[in-house]
A protein has these predicted regions:
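Membrane-embedded alpha-helical segments of multi-pass membrane proteins
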Residues: 40-57, 97-107, 169-177, 216-223
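Transmembrane signal-anchor hairpin modules in multi-pass inner-membrane enzymes, especially those
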Residues: 1-95, 112-129, 183-193, 234-247
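Residue-level signal for short amphipathic helical patches enriched in basic/charged
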Residues: 101, 116, 210
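Alpha-helical transmembrane segments of multi-pass inner-membrane proteins
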Residues: 52, 122-154, 161-232, 236, ...
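Short, flexible active-site loop motifs that bind/organize anionic cofactors or intermediates
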Residues: 111-114, 159, 205
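Non-cytosolic membrane-interface motifs at loop->transmembrane helix junctions
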Residues: 92-99, 155-160
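Small-residue-rich segments of transmembrane alpha-helices in multi-pass membrane proteins
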Residues: 74-80, 103-107, 130-136
């Protein structure tokens, strides 16, 4: 007898693979929306709330590692709800707790889907970087009044991109800038021009935000990352590359 080879492994399920791909794309789009918070609730808030709900309904897997994070978040939220009972005037406390709960659920959700497929982490960072470059460009164009109405992307002559506050805009750009810097130092030289251009745009956005906290975060985190990579990597060629790029 002869055996017939199938084009897919026995464990491969095209339907499930398609759903996973669609889910990953939807998550990436949600992360991209995080760079646009002109008004509240922001598109990111509504989109992620719906996405998290659907994903939980369809069966989001919570591993032990993610479950530990969820447990800590629940304890943290319980403390917040208990603190309300000690307040004479509740005021806006319920709204702050609701926002905190949403952020906690978002953190657990992202950890869970990354734990399920680690490749999603790179996808998330790529989407975050795309959002950072886009909103940084808006902030830069607004600062230089590049077109009529561009001032809407500034406040008090400070770039704020598609955010409500320059002090939120600046810190949002830090992680993508580190991601690009790490790629410049570790990835192939062919991708250097694109990464360098994106890093330049984001760096200018951080500068024009005139956020001292963002400046300090950018300088300290970049210096620490380069230093740790320099110490960890034993290759002389890599260390030379780090020195050349850093000094350049």
């Amino acid at each position: 007898m002869t055996t017939v080879e199938t084009p897919f492994p026995a464990t491969f399920k095209p339907g499930r693979a398609a759903l996973r791909l669609i889910g990953s794309v939807l998550v990436a789009f949600g992360v991209f929306l995080s760079g646009f918070v002109i008004d509240e609730p922001a598109p990111f808030d509504i989109y992620m709330a719906v996405l998290i709900g659907f994903w939980f309904i369809l069966g989001l897997k919570i591993s032990r590692t993610t479950g530990l994070l969820l447990a800590f978040m629940l304890v943290f939220m319980a403390g917040g709800f208990l603190s309300i009972t000690q307040m004479e005037t509740i005021g806006d406390a319920p709204m702050y707790l609701a926002v905190t709960l949403f952020l906690c659920l978002s953190a657990v959700f992202l950890c869970a889907i990354i734990d399920e497929d680690h490749r999603r982490l790179k996808l998330i960072f790529n989407a975050w970087t795309a959002a950072a470059v886009t909103t940084a460009m808006l902030g830069i164009l607004g600062y230089f009044k590049a077109f009529p109405g561009a001032e809407m992307f500034t406040r008090y002559d400070r770039a704020m991109g598609a955010f409500q506050d320059p002090n939120v805009f600046g810190p949002f750009l830090i992680a993508p800038s580190l991601y690009l810097l790490h790629g410049i130092l570790t990835e192939k030289i062919s991708g250097l021009p694109v990464r360098a251009a994106a890093l330049g745009i984001i760096s200018l956005g951080v500068l024009l935000s005139f956020s001292r906290a963002a400046w300090a975060m950018f300088a300290f985190s970049a210096a620490m990352m380069v230093l740790l990579m320099f110490i960890k990597e034993r290759s002389g060629a890599f260390r030379l590359k780090v020195l050349i790029i850093t000094l350049g």
